[in-house]
Amino acid sequence: IPDERNPFYTLPYFVIEPPVLSEKQEEYSDSKLDEFEISEAIHFSNGGGVYKAISSIDGSQLVIKEGRPEAGIDAMGRDAYTRVEHEGKILEQLKQCSNVVGYREIFKEWEHIFLVEEYVEGMSLQQWVASNYPFESNDQEEYAMKAMKLLENLKHAIEEIHSCGVGIGDLQPANIIIQKNLSIKLIDFEVADNIECEQPTGLMTI
């Protein structure tokens, strides 16, 4: 049986859907999710998926983050629903920060919560280092100049976020997106909080 990792409900060819499920599907046919065309599943976990989507309203490329209740429990006892809901509030607070992924909206559908963000073109800092590392000695100077530029941009982004009263909580290479002109966008603010908050994040990053 093929394990099709589709971002939507799929039946195996040999399964006939029971009438009760078909009726329920029709009952929930009017959905906020109909405003989006899901094009790709970026990530799956028991706490919820992360999906690339296109808005059927304005055609913009988006990322939709799903949080499921009582699943994906972290070290602080928070489930994925709570973390995604919290991230939405943080991103709304940081809407004026140019180096933070753009917040669009947050909504609830059935028992799950969905956070809609802009889709950021680029690669993670982790990928950038792997792609640009100077294996030849004559590339070292150019690499060093680019790395210093990235550090300056990252420092500015962190200062801007702190000026809005927010501590990131999960700053790691995978959450730093490098764009074509070496500008950056920070993503993943699930464990961000008030900068004065002394509660641990429950993660092993800074």
What is each PLM-predicted segment?
Residues 111-124, 128:
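Conserved short submotifs of the Hanks-type protein kinase catalytic core
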Residues 150-151:
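Activation segment signature within eukaryotic-like protein kinase domains
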Residues 39-40, 46-85:
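ATP-binding glycine-rich loop module of kinase domains
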